[in-house]
Amino acid sequence: MGLVPHVAENINGSDQMTSLFDRELVKNRTIYISGPIDSATALLAVAKLYYLSDISDDPITIIFVDCPGGSVTAGWAIYDAIQNVACEVSTVCMGMCASMGAFLLASGTKGKRIVTPNSEVMIHQPSAGTQGMVTDMEINIEHFQRVKRRINATLAKHTGKSEKQIKKDSERDHWMSAEEAVAYGLADEIDYGAQRRECD
């Protein structure tokens, strides 16, 4: 996330510049995930999720996701945090949720997974590469297959599709409109305005 907007706020009687994302984090329990998912992105998202879970009994946290994909292991870290925090987690796709981004969209609390009207969602099989000795490559390929099966099983759990269907659809890039993502079970509704009003 390159440019971070700042706003002036009166804190303890003095005007201070505050990151808009930090302000939204505390005021509206909102987290933003933008760009490819890596270990740094995951660390921030997980820390914010647990922080919000600890400081308040508020029943919901919102994660806005605009993501082309990224590291599977980093994505799993965010996924586990979403599943483990006490509050419900509403995931909102803004722009694009592809690959691991789509996985995180689907991982939100059932009934609270939202896509904005012009969003695009894409699932596919994980990509990976291997090199070295043949035996090591065979070990790595088997590991990649296990990862693929685990992702398919998890997507099946969250979408209501069969693992066989998920496997078939994700063999190649499978793009969906907002309407198609809802029909597929990756999201529950197309509704941006109502989600913002819920914070007020």
Q: What are the roles of these predicted feature ranges?
A:
Residues M1-D200:
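Terminal-region recognition feature
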